[in-house]
């Protein structure tokens, strides 16, 4: 069992607070916890940068923080794009032939709904429009196409949505055997599988961000609940696993934060702000 968040007594050195979104900052119903804007302001008053680190694209994350996106950092697309105060400071691109190969397999794999991520845009097959209710939560600008074959766009990530909530099974049995030597694959919960270039993950995104901020990884606090948070949790000085996370995640955190439905991230931020005063 991880020590409680109350055991972290070196909070005054923190300069960056990075949090995953789904099942970490957000409640189970996808709602933002009450008071998050006040906490971002409080961190800023003490020179501490707030960062949303997510598999979601930059546009969706900016819209999640309408009053603060110009004052915060965003690690989007699992580290494939990084923004600091609305400025793109890093981006990565997947080879076009390679993303077409992934899409071709996904199109022909039952239960797979592929999404080609192109920074603020996303491309989805017309046949999968029935899933728009879910997809639009994560992708604000969706273009539906009859086929991926003729697409020639810059892409930093491929995502696959699994309505059967069996992403790990599909990762192990279908996609990892085909691509894990050429791409980094990670599950984002039970319903999503993400593909980025090898070396691209939330951890690499945080590394790019701290380089631009001129701070050390030891001065970063990070919060997460699932597989795609592991690279970020493993490298920071203050890693918090949410109480609602699966037990295997405890190996990747130093402390246990209250659950997402208890606004656990905000509870720890309050302690960070108090230590900075």
Q: Residue locations for each model-derived region?
A:
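Mg2+-dependent phosphoryl-transfer enzymes with acidic/Ser/Thr/Gly-rich catalytic loops
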Residues: 6-16, 32-33, 194-277
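Short hydrophobic/aromatic-enriched beta-strand-loop microsegments
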Residues: 71-77, 92, 135-136, 239-243, ...
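Hydrophobic packing residues within well-ordered alpha-helices of enzyme cores
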Residues: 36, 61-65, 171, 175, ...
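N-terminal glycine-/serine-/threonine-rich phosphate-binding loop
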Residues: 2-46, 50
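Short, structured coil segments at secondary-structure junctions
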Residues: 67-70, 78, 178-181, 235-236, ...
């Amino acid at each position: 069992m991880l020590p409680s968040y109350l055991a972290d007594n070196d909070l005054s050195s923190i300069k960056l607070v990075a949090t995953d979104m789904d099942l970490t900052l957000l409640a189970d119903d996808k709602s933002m916890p009450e008071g998050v804007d006040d906490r971002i302001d409080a961190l800023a008053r003490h020179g501490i940068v707030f960062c949303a680190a997510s598999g979601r694209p930059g546009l969706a994350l900016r819209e999640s923080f309408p009053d603060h996106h110009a004052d915060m950092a965003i690690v989007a697309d699992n580290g494939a794009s990084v923004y600091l105060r609305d400025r793109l400071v890093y981006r990565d691109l997947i080879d076009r032939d390679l993303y077409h190969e992934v899409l071709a397999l996904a199109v022909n794999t039952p239960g797979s709904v592929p999404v080609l991520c192109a920074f603020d845009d996303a491309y989805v097959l017309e046949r999968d429009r029935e899933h728009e209710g879910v997809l639009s939560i994560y992708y604000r600008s969706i273009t539906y196409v009859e086929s991926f074959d003729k697409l020639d766009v810059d892409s930093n990530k491929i995502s696959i949505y699994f309505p059967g909530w069996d992403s790990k099974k599909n990762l192990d049995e279908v996609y990892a055997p085909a691509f894990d030597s050429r791409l980094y694959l990670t599950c984002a919960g039970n319903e999503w599988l993400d593909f980025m270039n090898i070396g691209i993950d939330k951890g690499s995104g945080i590394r790019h961000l701290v380089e631009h901020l001129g701070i050390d990884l030891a001065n970063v606090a990070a919060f997460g609940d699932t597989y795609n948070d592991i690279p970020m949790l493993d490298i920071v000085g203050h890693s918090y696993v949410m109480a609602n996370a699966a037990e295997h995640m405890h190996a990747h955190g130093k402390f246990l934060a209250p659950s997402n439905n208890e606004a656990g991230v905000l509870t720890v931020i309050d302690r960070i702000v108090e230590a900075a005063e």
